[in-house]
């Protein structure tokens, strides 16, 4: 994954895909993983990656977008740190114009003048994107705040505003996580959050999958 510092953990590359494939074989859970370079697409296809994530920093990497558009693998497209909604939608169009209609948009917080949290969640992006496009919209409350204690509140707000899904960081030992530990929930905290969100989802006529 792209990191601000070149000295930060960069991911496990091909070995990481092998581990994800093993985890899928044991649990049945699909693989969603980030693509950094179009040269890695054959490896993703060979592994049978279920969904490609295009991260915020690559939202306007148009050659990469066109390359994933020529695959038949669904794409999770994250909004750039300072991108407008129109720019996000146009990036999705780059993918779909190449023949891949399976795009999910992700609001993950944008950069503002506020410094007390990592980013600022643009909760209004959900209804606006649903007005602008037919694509599903999910929210990443973990990156939006960068602080674990805020994740449950933002997740509940995302459900209330109509998000189609949530992307939440979970780690069994956040203090020792290679990346994003400060924003990660423990498994117990995640279970508690899902238990509190379930009634909210039922109120809005949705289910927890």
Q: Where are the regions a protein language model picked out?
A:
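Glycine-enriched alpha-helix->loop->beta-strand junction motifs that scaffold or abut catalytic
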Residues: 43-52, 67-75, 96-102, 133-136, ...
